[in-house]
Amino acid sequence: MSRPSLTRFLIEEQHAGRIDAELRQLITIVSRACKRISIAVSKGALGGVLGDAGTGNVQGEAQKKLDVLSNDILLEANAWGGHLAACASEEMDHSQPVPDQYPSGDFLLLFDPLDGSSNIDVNVSVGTIFSVLRAPKGTEKPGDEHFLQPGTQQVAAGYCIYGPSTMLVLTLGHGTHAFTLEREEGSFLLTQANMRVPEDTAEYAINMSNQRHWEPAMQAYVGDLLAGKDGARGKDFNMRWIASMVADVHRILTRGGIFIYPWDKKDPSKPGKLRLMYEANPMSMLVEQAGGAATTGRERILDIQPTQLHQRVPVFLGSKNEVAEATRYHLDADKA
């Protein structure tokens, strides 16, 4: 029996009344853009796309050539279809409405065009993360303020991981599903429906080099993980860290674990590393739809009311019971 394609999956979701034609078109166009990015990434040095672009983004980070190329691909692909009102990117200072010469649609698209791009030159898996919101009714030219909706308002979220195979992981609010790119025919085919994150885990992903900058609750939590079966947790834990959020979260969606990027005082102007709108919200929706959980260590990420387009937050996401345990350490410390 042949595997359903992404196109068929989306049409069936539309027939079931779970999405409308505009959202189906939007996801289809994003998936096509991801195919183009996948081709560019796979060429590596042969495509002349490695290295720095010589520019910086609004985050103050040096842009890679592939950051800029991926951003341009997503902008161009989504400009003219009539399904989008505006888009916002980690690589742009402000949101960008659809050009005047094209029809405007009902949706807002946010994306990190190439998450983990610092790993490109060493051939580690990277990916595109995206989030879809509805434009507020009556909004003719959406601005930054119209994107400031809590993650619970997302109508779709996903990522495309460019690794040994290219995979699109998607939620439309009814489970999380994985599609693998069949390169010969150029189609994303459903390879894992209704992904489930195990409730318990003995695996965590964190950058331990920042340990000295963590708050006491975080120090205590990781200290107990490191103590293993001889400590308070009574079991051994393994640590994994790829330094590419897409790759780390994909592993957790596949076999469980907890991904942690906590609050730290390394840079007081950036106490949280990850962006709420482009990374934390879409990944939290995907993980929750797969039975996992996602918090800042103190509150559910999807409940946060954003105040800035490029807002940063701490992130704890993955296996539900372990996220709850990590959150408990922080809440108990706050009460002490």
From Swiss-Prot:
Mg(2+) 1 binds at residues 90, 112, 114. Mg(2+) 2 binds at residues 112, 115, 279. CDD domains: FBPase. Its cofactor is Mg(2+). One of its GO terms (biological process) is gluconeogenesis. Binds 2 magnesium ions per subunit. It is found in: Cytoplasm. Transmembrane segments: none annotated. Pathway: Carbohydrate biosynthesis; gluconeogenesis. One of its GO terms (molecular function) is fructose 1,6-bisphosphate 1-phosphatase activity. Substrate binds at residues 115-118, 207, 273. It is an enzyme of class 3 (hydrolase). Homotetramer. HAMAP family: FBPase_class1 (MF_01855). Belongs to the FBPase class 1 family. This is Fructose-1,6-bisphosphatase class 1. The gene is fbp.
